[in-house]
């Protein structure tokens, strides 16, 4: 399944402490699988890392020849349901849909803005075998 939010998209935080902030998506984690204390697999909801949003402080040990120790500030994860794509055409936060367009023997899949109904970008392109 294609992702509604991708790396490089500009998004707006719509819920939480950081509400209203905008930033560029640095990384998208579709689904993270971890184990709990009992060793059972746990699946976490998808989340994104957004540039300049939800800055957290980490205490790091120095590694000789690599980095200095101290307190560093880095972006923390935000649940993907708490952000909306900022449409490049109408410049508003919007929900994203998918549209399939067939032209001749080529099938193209686009992401589109549900507010202004304009295509955002091409997701995939397939050549249909003629019959």
From Swiss-Prot:
One of its GO terms (biological process) is translation. GO terms for cellular component: ribonucleoprotein complex; ribosome. The keyword Chloroplast does not apply. GO terms for molecular function: rRNA binding; structural constituent of ribosome. Keywords: Ribonucleoprotein, Ribosomal protein, RNA-binding, rRNA-binding. Transmembrane segments: none annotated. It holds the Pfam family ribosomal_L24. Signal peptide: none annotated. PANTHER family: MITOCHONDRIAL RIBOSOMAL PROTEIN L24 (PTHR12903). HAMAP family: Ribosomal_uL24_B (MF_01326_B). Part of the 50S ribosomal subunit. Belongs to the universal ribosomal protein uL24 family. One of two assembly initiator proteins, it binds directly to the 5'-end of the 23S rRNA, where it nucleates assembly of the 50S subunit. One of the proteins that surrounds the polypeptide exit tunnel on the outside of the subunit. This is Large ribosomal subunit protein uL24. The lineage of its organism: Bacteria, Pseudomonadati, Aquificota, Aquificia, Aquificales.
């Amino acid at each position: 399944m294609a992702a509604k939010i991708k790396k490089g998209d500009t998004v707006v935080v719509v819920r939480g402490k950081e509400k209203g902030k905008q930033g560029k998506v640095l990384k998208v984690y579709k689904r993270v699988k971890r184990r709990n204390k009992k060793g059972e697999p746990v699946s976490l909801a998808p989340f994104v890392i957004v540039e300049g949003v939800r800055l957290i402080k980490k205490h790091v040990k120095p590694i000789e020849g690599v980095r200095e120790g101290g307190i560093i500030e880095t972006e923390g994860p935000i649940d993907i349901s708490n952000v909306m794509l900022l449409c490049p055409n109408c410049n508003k936060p919007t929900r994203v849909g998918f549209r399939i367009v067939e032209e001749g023997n080529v099938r193209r899949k686009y992401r589109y803005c549900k507010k202004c109904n304009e295509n955002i970008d091409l997701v995939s392109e397939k050549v249909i075998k003629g019959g």
